[in-house]
Amino acid sequence: MERDFPGQRIGPEPTTDRFVAVMNGKAEKVTPGNAAAMDSSRPFRALNRFGSGFLSKFEVSQCPSPILKDIYFVDTPGVLSGEKQRIGRSYDFAALIEWFATRADRILLLFDAHKLDISDEFRRSIEMLKGHDDKIRVVLNKSDRVSNQQLMRVYGAMMWSLGKVVRSPEVLRVYISSFWDKPYADVGASNKDLFDKERNDLLADLRSLPRNSAV
């Protein structure tokens, strides 16, 4: 998108428990979940069955962006770990992952290379993607923040962990890069050519999706 979207929150730990549908619009606007689920022009009316506990944690963010003319994104909450998983949700997180996965054309699993963590909640969420293996792409983000040797170890550990959860005969496609508009960190600068190619490959994959696809 090459820009932030309205209501975006970024941090080293999960900074939101909201599902955010990021869609194209002439002006920047955030629509609360209750209103979005009542709008017949949007594909979210079926979300009413998850109740107000979820709808209060769902919103539609609109902004002008060329890529959003063809697809829209659903940004899911950062996964929780430990005790936070048990008390931190007012809705069925895994059931919602399954609902969105059924309707999505592409599913991106994001991992940070400098902080690889597959919590129990993330593992259960991945298990809910069973039957959608062809839609899944893995993104190893912030790969420029680790050395070549560390990157190899992180990649191996990630694929080993995913192999225990994703029961697919096909090899998952993994994109290794740093997916924001900042310069690469010095420690990973030697992989610039690789990171550039991987970033372009991911964008090409998204652009190949049918018009009005969901990610």
Each language-model region and where it sits:
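Inter-motif core of Ras-like GTPase G domains
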Residues: 64-114, 125-139
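Short coil/turn segments at secondary-structure boundaries
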Residues: 11-13, 34-37, 84-89, 112-113, ...
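Amphipathic alpha-helical interface elements that mediate macromolecular binding in regulatory proteins
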Residues: 17-20, 71-74, 91-98, 102-105, ...
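Conserved nucleotide-binding/hydrolysis micro-motifs of P-loop NTPases
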Residues: 26-29, 78-80, 114-116, 143-146, ...
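Short interface patches used for recognition in eukaryotic signaling and trafficking proteins
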Residues: 4-7, 81-88, 109, 140-145, ...
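Canonical P-loop GTPase G-domain recognition
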Residues: 128-137, 142-214
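Conserved G1/Walker A P-loop phosphate-binding module
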Residues: 1-82
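Eukaryotic intrinsically disordered and solvent-exposed regulatory patches
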Residues: 6-9, 56-61, 88, 92-97, ...
